[in-house]
A protein has these predicted regions:
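Basic, helix-initiating cap at the start of DNA-binding domains
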Residues: 1-45, 58-59
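Key DNA-contact positions within bacterial/archaeal DNA-binding proteins
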Residues: 48
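Hydrophobic/aromatic-rich alpha-helical bundle segments in the mid-to-C-terminal region
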Residues: 115-120, 130-196
Length: 196
């Protein structure tokens, strides 16, 4: 999923400032250890304003995950390039101060409330758009692609697994692309070679 660098902007609305503060909080603290009061204090607004703007902590968490992942960009210009798009995204180097969706997800794995929100995000913002673009792909396989990407991302960015960080980057990229294509059951004729 596209990467997100969080930085203040003088043109940000209060709602946008709240969302940026939430992304920062949720990427550094678990869902259960992050309160609306903390986020409100980070922005300098009343907690009631945060609630009016987003409705609940769960809805704010969902918006933070969605904004950090920008899933709509993944499926906007697919045209047979989805395995390449997903591969480039998961293998791209993380820039300083960059927050990725996995940074938020990893902080809140153990929270049942966060898991419900993450499941909703997976369904609505990854599985459904993928299946809409590729109607022959079962929902189960779309979810398996997400699982594979999460695993690669965790091993690469969190565990720092040497086989994913050292060696032939082009070979790794091709391996990941082919695994995604295999999960989706896309044959060589289904892939646009101009995506490479």
């Amino acid at each position: 999923m596209p990467n997100r660098v969080i930085s203040p902007d003088a043109n940000d609305t209060t709602r946008e400032r709240i969302l940026k503060a939430a992304i920062l909080r949720f990427s550094a603290h678990s869902y259960d250890n992050t309160g609306l009061r903390d986020i409100a204090a980070d922005v300098g607004v009343d907690m009631a304003y945060v609630q009016r703007s987003f409705g609940s902590k769960e809805k704010l968490f969902y918006e933070a995950v969605k904004e950090s992942g920008k899933p709509e960009q993944l499926f906007a210009d697919d045209d047979g390039c989805l395995p390449s798009i997903l591969t480039k995204q998961i293998l791209s180097r993380k820039a300083a101060n960059e927050i990725r969706v996995l940074d938020i997800v990893i902080q809140s794995f153990a929270s049942p409330a966060a898991s419900r929100v993450l499941n909703e995000f997976l369904e609505e913002d990854f599985v459904t758009p993928l299946v809409s673009k590729h109607p022959m792909v079962p929902r189960r396989r779309a979810a398996l692609v997400a699982a594979f990407l999460a695993g690669v991302g965790i091993l690469k960015d969190v565990i720092k697994a040497d086989p994913l960080l050292k060696g032939d980057a082009a070979a790794l990229e091709e391996d990941v692309r082919m695994v995604i294509a295999a999960i989706l059951e896309l044959g060589p004729n289904d892939l646009d070679t101009s995506c490479d």
